[in-house]
Amino acid sequence: MPTIQQLIHSAREKITNKTKSPALKACPQRRGVCTRVYTTTPKKPNSALRKVARIRLTTGFEVTAYIPGVGHTLQEHSVVLVRGGRVKDLPGVRYHIVRGTLDTAGVKGRLKSRSKYGVKKPKKK
């Protein structure tokens, strides 16, 4: 507990929160261009081939982003929209690609949780 004299000498320091997605520069999403699309393996208890892409953002950052959903058509030079959100079992992957925007198509044949994967409502027969 500081004395009043100590508080007069120097005020209390504000606690600043460190952002978990610095490359977005305080924006909800950012546009970027894929420089490399590849698969990588997750951390220890899990086993899979996770689809990720290296992306150069409009902010100038080069980040690794996860491609959610089953199947994708992304390749080098594809323009994508990137949002924050890490993938727990992939170290260094702190961003997600938004499906159904720009060059990223929605997940084919998806009927549940469609809004998360950029799929339009199916036509009623």
Swiss-Prot record:
**Record's subcellular location:** Plastid, Chloroplast
GO terms in the biological process aspect are: translation
Q: Which UniProt keywords apply?
A: Chloroplast, Plastid, Ribonucleoprotein, Ribosomal protein, RNA-binding, rRNA-binding
Question: Does the keyword Membrane belong to this entry?
Answer: no
Please report a single Pfam family linked to this protein.
Ribosom_S12_S23
Gene Ontology terms, cellular component aspect?
chloroplast; small ribosomal subunit
**Disulfide bond keyword on record:** no
What Gene Ontology terms describe what this protein does at the molecular function level? rRNA binding; structural constituent of ribosome
Classification via PROSITE patterns: RIBOSOMAL_S12
Q: Where primarily located? A: plastid
Q: How does it assemble?
A: Part of the 30S ribosomal subunit.
Please give the function described in this protein's UniProt entry.
Answer: With S4 and S5 plays an important role in translational accuracy. Located at the interface of the 30S and 50S subunits.
UniProt record similarity statement: Belongs to the universal ribosomal protein uS12 family.
HAMAP family to which the protein is assigned, alphabetical? Ribosomal_uS12_B (MF_00403_B)
What name is this protein filed under? Small ribosomal subunit protein uS12c
Species whose genome carries this gene = Tupiella akineta
Name the gene. Answer: rps12
